Amino acid sequence: MPTFATPAPITAAVQVAGAQVRVTASDRTDTVVLVEPINEASASDLKVASKTEVDFAGGQLTVKTTVSGDKRGSVAIAIDLPADSRLVANLAYSSVHADGPLGACELHMASGQVQLDHIDALQANIAAGEVAIGHIARRANIDGGGFVMRIGEAKGTVGLSSSGGQAWIGHAFADLDLSSGSGNFDIDRADASITATTASGAIRIGRLTHGQAKLMSGSGDIEVGISEDTAASIDVNSERGAVHDSVSSQGNSEPSDHRVMVHARTRHGDIIIQRAAS
């Protein structure tokens, strides 16, 4: 079990194929790595584990599978490291599960699953796979193919570009710039401006409290909820669909310090503008 003295946060670079990786970040002054075959009775799993390289130099931990594992997973890798360490992961049919606070993270995924707890920032290129992140403190830049992205809280701006898939954000505190060829966007709450464009997909904002929403879908429904205490300027149109705008029909009877603007267009689909559920 390799152990390295690390009194400060480090960079953990993981390059794996057919691996299950677990990262635990906590208040500690060393880094410990454990590499084990998932099936000790499997000669191929034993080979992948024995050929996995672990090295530490210049503040960077490197873990690399030199022999590709099975797509079901051949090697289990556990990394315990200092809180706020950076994670750089290159993954092929692998999974990463991280607990505890990490610094800036960089993901390059051919396929796989990633679950991160609390990170500082994100740079990601995802060909395929699923990513779930509890909290991002600063900027996130995400691009790739058809993937599923879930973010509980985004404190910084988010830029996302994909060919397809789905993106869900629980609470966006800063601006969002989202685009997809055939993806769906689902935002529970947005406290800043949103630009969302998809050629074929649905766009939903559960609650918009501030800023401007510019929403465009070639084929798909659009739904926006607006807070009760927020005045709204609405400009929406569907070429081949129904428009239900209960906010404009109610008017803004009382002065409000909060105002949002909604500009929405879809060619094939319905548009719903309504007051957000309390």
PLM region spans:
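Intrinsically disordered, low-complexity terminal regions
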Residues: 1-278
